Design a protein with these regions (language model features):
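NAD(P)-dependent short-chain dehydrogenase/reductase
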Residues: 7-65, 70-75, 107-108
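C-terminal substrate-binding subdomain of Rossmann-fold SDR/epimerase-dehydratase oxidoreductases
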Residues: 52, 57-165
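Active-site helix of classical SDR
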Residues: 1
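Active-site His/Glu-centered metal-binding helix of metallohydrolases
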Residues: 4
Length: 165
């Protein structure tokens, strides 16, 4: 697991002097050559463009979660590498904290009234939470990614791949 990997890094730092840091990324969204469609933003865009109802856990509609633009993830990695800042600390890397309802509303500005299929099954993570990137922001890194722009780019890409206009 991710936490086990963090413990391993701390142990290697103690035992062998490994210089490291940990980036805890929000849920990634955005276009890339190897896009994945199992997380909320990309999955909902895919479903909406191809005329499928968005599958939403009813209990998750208003839960807040941390999201991260792919470009922001890369810029954070480069930020740390360029500064050689391997201080063993944990850094949350987040573009924005949003609800599923927020994401659906943004998709709705590009695709009129996407259908929603509410799922009443229990989800693995029932928690609603926000994550702060303050620790890395005070060092000078800022998220610049835009969920709105990323949704527009994802929808445009999927439409070119054969989705509905």
């Amino acid at each position: 697991s991710k936490l086990e990997a963090e413990r391993l890094l701390r142990g290697l730092a103690r035992e062998r002097g490994l210089r490291h840091l940990v980036c805890r990324f929000g849920t990634i969204f955005g276009t890339s050559p190897g896009m994945r469609f199992h997380t909320a933003v990309n999955k909902f865009c895919w479903q909406a463009v191809f005329g499928q109802p968005l599958t939403v856990w009813r209990t998750a509609l208003h839960q807040r979660r941390p999201y991260l633009d792919l470009a922001d993830a890369l810029s954070a990695i480069f930020f740390f590498i360029r500064r050689g800042r391997f201080d063993g600390r944990i850094y949350n890397i987040v573009s924005r904290n949003l609800t599923v309802a927020d994401i659906i509303a943004m998709i709705g500005t590009h695709i009129t009234a996407p259908a929603i299929d509410y799922v009443d099954n229990e989800i693995m993570n029932q928690l609603s939470y926000e994550v702060s990137s303050r620790r890395v922001q005070v060092l000078g890194w800022q998220a610049t990614g835009s969920l709105e722009n990323s949704i527009a780019a994802t929808i445009a890409l999927l439409r070119r791949a054969g989705g509905r206009p």
